[in-house]
């Protein structure tokens, strides 16, 4: 039986069609081994892409770019880096890793990561008749370096504790905990971002007693789960309001005594007739209670307007924290000092101004008294002599 002459040709055609089908089933595509990458601020990140199935991309155009950016992060074309077309913010910070370029694997290494590098990236391969893109996301993280707890001066409501931290990205989670790990409700929480996009957080807590034991400020990064804790233990004396009266009562008594000095001085000088002319008009006004109180309040207001803002919040790391914490005693000392500084200068000025007049008055009064005493003595002698003469006359008549 004779074979057909076209059998070899037919087999070749079938084989060719089979290869075409296989080639179409193995169409090239771009993928990335990791779609989500983590990188710390100041560290480095490696964005990898590869062609599947393995295929040399040495003569392809490889581009990394970001949505919304007109310039690519990195551009590889014709076997060379196209630096002039890359975005300037990535200049001298990128490296093209091409050890496995013959297998279709390439990477872009970014150094000195900053917060602006956070976000999605796209990697594209372009060749005649082939183009494909893979997307990956770079998550940049930063953990704050310092956490401070500030304590406001206690008042009738309790003690306000404030936790401050900065240098975080993305925005961290904050909460107060007690010594048993239970979450405490915060009074206020706020945040801000600086020019470098770092987050700065502030959280406050109002404490009315020390039943919670130690107080812990917890801050955690929502991406990495890293957590930082700072704790404090406040003295029980801060929550004991009885000590207020220990300072307020003696201060009130002493203030009344000091404020009463000038009116008594005024009354004394007037009784002696020392004040005359302008002084007789000014002295009652200057030494009156309303003028003293207004002067004292004005001086106190000016002092506290300058003083209190500088000690409103005190860090536990401040070496003067024990001094600032005893604010009641400190406040009373300042007010007492103001009172003394108000009373003494006026008293001294009055004494200096009125002493010459009073001395003259006192000398005159002294002379009058002596004269009156001398006249009284003569009158007594005359009376005694008269009595003796009367007695002698009566005896003679008898």
Curated annotation (Swiss-Prot):
Disulfide bond entries: 49-123, 163-217
Extracellular side: 26-244, 310-331
Annotated signal peptide: 1-25
InterPro entries tied to this protein: BTN3A2-like_Ig-C, Ig-like_dom, Ig-like_dom_sf, Ig-like_fold, Ig_sub, Ig_V-set, IgSF_BTN/MOG
Keywords: Disulfide bond, Glycoprotein, Immunoglobulin domain, Membrane, Repeat, Signal, Transmembrane, Transmembrane helix
Occurrences of domain Ig-like V-type (ranges): 26-141
Disulfide bond listed as a keyword: yes
Domain of life: Eukaryota
Residue numbers on the Cytoplasmic membrane side: 266-288, 353-398
Record-linked Pfam families: C2-set_3, V-set
Tissue spec. comment: Expressed in skin, thymus, testis and, to a lower extent, bladder, brain, heart, kidney, mammary gland, small intestine and uterus.
CDD domains, A to Z: IgV_MOG_like (cd05713)
Ig-like C1-type domain mapped to chain residues: 142-233
Carbohydrate attachment residues: 92, 139
Cell compartments where the protein resides: Membrane
Function (record text): May act by engaging a cell surface molecule on immature T-cells in the embryonic thymus.
General remark: Encoded by one of the 11 copies of Skint genes clustered in the D1 region of the chromosome 4.
Name listed for the protein in its UniProt record: Selection and upkeep of intraepithelial T-cells protein 8
Lineage: Eukaryota, Metazoa, Chordata, Craniata, Vertebrata
